[in-house]
């Protein structure tokens, strides 16, 4: 019995120059993403978005490689929850020796999550290793991790009618107030 060529199923993908080009392009993109890191600077603290995390966001389809924006947005949301300081209660050990918690403060850092997502996607597409601060919608003067006062503040006691000025954690001056 002899069968002709029409009986055999044709392969879905045939080796061709076009296919080789597509595979080469996809491999190049994968290598680019696998070698990319983004280091977020929070004063002396750094949070690194490494290539393993970035790789877990990649979606490979026939048309190419894309980044799962929801996964990237979740990463940014978690980072914002960790490092945002605006409206976060702060506890101080006062000059008079008591602890006081200040709530609803309007000073501090807040990551602009939408703008940060846009910037992060641009960083990833560049394929370069990046070190930078996140995009903020609100920022302070100085920070180290979640400490955005860095020992610089004015303390006022209305009961004692007294003011203390601290710079870099050291008392600079104090005075009575009325």
How would you label these PLM feature ranges?
Residues 1-178:
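Surface-exposed, secretory/extracytoplasmic low-complexity segments enriched in Ser/Thr/Asn/Gly/Pro
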């Amino acid at each position: 019995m002899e069968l002709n060529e029409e009986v055999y199923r044709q392969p879905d993908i045939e080796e061709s120059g076009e296919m080789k080009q597509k595979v080469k392009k996809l491999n190049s993109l994968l290598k680019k993403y696998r070698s990319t890191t983004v280091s977020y600077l929070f004063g002396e603290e750094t949070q690194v978005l490494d290539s393993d995390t970035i790789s877990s966001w990649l979606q490979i389809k026939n048309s190419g490689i894309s980044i799962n924006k929801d996964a990237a947005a979740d990463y940014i949301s978690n980072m914002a929850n960790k490092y945002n300081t605006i409206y976060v209660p702060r506890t101080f050990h006062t000059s008079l020796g008591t602890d006081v918690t200040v709530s609803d403060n309007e000073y501090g850092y807040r990551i602009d999550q939408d703008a940060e997502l846009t910037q992060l996607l641009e960083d990833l597409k560049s394929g370069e290793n990046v070190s930078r601060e996140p995009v903020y919608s609100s920022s302070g003067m100085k920070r180290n991790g979640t400490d955005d006062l860095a020992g610089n503040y004015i303390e006022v006691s209305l009961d004692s009618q007294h003011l203390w000025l601290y710079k870099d954690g050291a008392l600079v001056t104090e005075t009575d107030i009325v």
